[in-house]
Amino acid sequence: DITKGSPDISVAIVDNGFNLKHPEFKGRVCGAYNVWRHSDKVDAHKVDHGTHVAGIALASMDNGAGSCGIAPQCAFIPVQVADEKDRMTTTSILDGILYAIYQGADVVNVSLGQCLNGLDEYSEAVQQELINNHFKEEERLWNKVMQIAEKHHCVIVFAAGNDNVLAGIDPQQRSQGCVVVSAVNKKNQPILKADFSNYGDYSTVSAPGVDIYSSCGDGYALMSGTSMAAPIVTGLVALLKSVK
């Protein structure tokens, strides 16, 4: 083992909410922020997406329970971008990412994005036309965010999405400075793309995303999605930064 992560390396998880009382995060939470309340009061949600995502990247080791995250000794910055009804906006996600960057996060995980349900009924040519010619204002905005992240030596990792369409239709995934993660099904031999995963030229890398075991609520659960694949890569980035 070269490293299990350094406490000097901080990982921000931008997500709907978190159970910060979960034992997997004991002693490693710093700089928690709720963009809706403008405070450090962070809540768990009924669909405990954020807690599960955070555990994949950061769950503790040697605590006699559950699972171990990819970077179990790195610091954890939880950033809640959903309100009490689990509503999120592009602005709240942007606020969360920028907060994490200026808070000094070394890597930011964003397992969130636009729902593109139904677009898989259209050909890849039509999907590529959307990427090439639409949402250009948003694309320029996200390019600026990535420039800010690069200036602060921060890596942004996005989940590719679960609509079985081309990655990059969502303009937050188009910047060269970000990492976009698709999902594979580890049960397939040879390993293949998960049925739901977005894919294509704007996908940077793939990681397991089917039946991933992690912290959830007060316990643990299996979840599937590119949301689960992204924090595996986020944890790896944190490990790489820990040995530099």
Regions found by a protein language model. Name each.
Residues A12, G96, A100, A105, ...:
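Small-residue (primarily alanine) positions within well-ordered alpha-helices
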Residues I2-T3, G64, K144-A149, K244:
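Alpha-helix termini
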Residues S10-D15, V181, V205-S206:
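A structural motif
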Residues E24, T204-A207:
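Generic alpha-helical secondary structure signal
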Residues A54-A57, I77-D83, D106, L192, ...:
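Hydrolase catalytic cores
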Residues D1-I77, V81-M88, S92-E137, K187:
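Active-site core segment of subtilase-fold serine proteases
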Residues S67, T90, G113-T204, D211-T234:
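Substrate-binding/specificity loop regions of serine endopeptidase catalytic domains
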